[in-house]
Amino acid sequence: RSITEQILQHPGETFDVSPFVDGRCKTPIEEIQAAVDGAISKEQAAKLRQCLNHIDELEIHKAEIEREIFRLSDKYECVLNLVRTVPGFDKNPLTAIQVLSEIGGDMSVFPTAKNLVSWAGCCPRNDQSNHKIKSTRISRAGSYFKPVLVQVANALIKSKKHPEFTTRYRRIKAHRGHKKAIIAICRMILTAIWHILTDLKPYTPEGFLESRPVKKEKVLT
C-alpha cells in the first residue's frame, strides 16, 4: 500500500522501493522496482484511489464485526481464557473464539477426546475390505474448523518453546511426510483442548505428557 500511495502522490517520478518493502516480502526487490517504473495515466490513478478507498471501507467494516464478536463472547471469557492457554491460541484472540464457536464449551457432548477429534475430521478413515486397507485419508468433516487447526499447527512446529509438539512432528514427518505430521499435531491440539475444557484446568505440557501411557521397556532373554 505504501508503494501505491507513493505512486499516487508523485506520479511519473522514479523512486527506490526498498524503504517501502516489508522484510517478509518474498518477491525480489528488483522485480518490484521494474513493476513500478514508468508513468500512470489520470484514469489509472483514479482507479487506484478507488481501490484504496474500498480497502479502507472494508477495514472499517471488519473492525465493526470484530467488536461485535468480542461483545458476544464476553460471557464465555472464562472458557476462552482456558483455550488461550493452549500453545498457538495466545496471540490472536479471535482464534480461540473461532474454535469455541465450533466445538462449544460443554465437552459432555464428546464422551472422549477421540470423539472430538473424529468430529473435527482429523481422524484417519479405516476403509478396509477383506483385510485390504483401501484408504486411510482423513474425513471431509470440519471443513471450516480444520483449516484453523492446521494454521495453528504450522505455527507451532516453528516454535522452540513447545518441544512436546515439535518433537512429535519431526518424528512423524520422518517416515510419513509433512501433511500427516501436521494432522497429528492437530489431534494433539484438540486432545489438549478437550482435557482442559473437561477438567477446567489450564494447559500444561507436563500434564499432556503425563496423560500419555509410558511404554514398558522390553527385555530380551
Describe the residue ranges of each PLM region.
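A detector of single, family-specific signature residues
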Residues: 1-221
